[in-house]
């Protein structure tokens, strides 16, 4: 069985209720760390990315679509890269990372992006 590794990690700024990030759309906020990972890892063939899985609890309003897919596009990743949004409430991000690792370990994927995006408005 293939091993899965976390090769890089980044997070968005920590905000507070009604703070400076309250007006930032969920997909725009999620695209920031994705774009930064792409820039920091320029030698990676991002066209070979199998999927991007992001946790997002309680999608509503502007969040009421596939936030992961929108973040992939906003981050400038190739249009061929899919995105899957996982909703497990508080465990969404953990489930997204676990699912990405399982895809790699089972041989269904070779390169995955996974994480979470939360926003307290």
Where are these predicted regions, by residue range?
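Condensing-enzyme catalytic core mediating Claisen C-C bond formation in acyl metabolism
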Residues: 1-24, 36
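General beta-strand structural signal in soluble alpha/beta enzymes
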Residues: 6-7, 54, 82, 113-115
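Conserved catalytic cysteine-centered active-site region
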Residues: 24, 56-110
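Short, well-ordered amphipathic alpha-helical segments that serve as non-catalytic structural scaffolds
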Residues: 26-42, 67-71, 96
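Signal peptide-proximal N-terminal region
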Residues: 35-48, 76-79
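Short glycine-rich phosphate-binding loop at a beta-alpha junction
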Residues: 47-55
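Conserved small/polar residues in nucleotide/adenosyl-binding loops
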Residues: 118-121
């Amino acid at each position: 069985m293939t091993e899965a590794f976390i090769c890089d990690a980044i997070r968005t700024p920590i905000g507070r209720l009604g703070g400076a990030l309250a007006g930032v759309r969920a997909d725009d906020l999620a695209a920031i760390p994705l774009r930064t990972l792409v820039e920091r890892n320029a030698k990676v063939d991002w066209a070979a990315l199998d999927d991007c899985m992001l946790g997002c609890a309680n999608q509503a309003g502007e969040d009421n679509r596939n936030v992961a897919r929108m973040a992939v596009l906003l981050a400038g990743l190739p249009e061929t890269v899919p995105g899957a949004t996982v909703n497990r409430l508080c465990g969404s991000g953990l489930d997204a990372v676990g699912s990405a690792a399982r895809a790699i370990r089972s041989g269904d994927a070779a390169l995955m992006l996974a994480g979470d995006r939360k926003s307290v408005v």
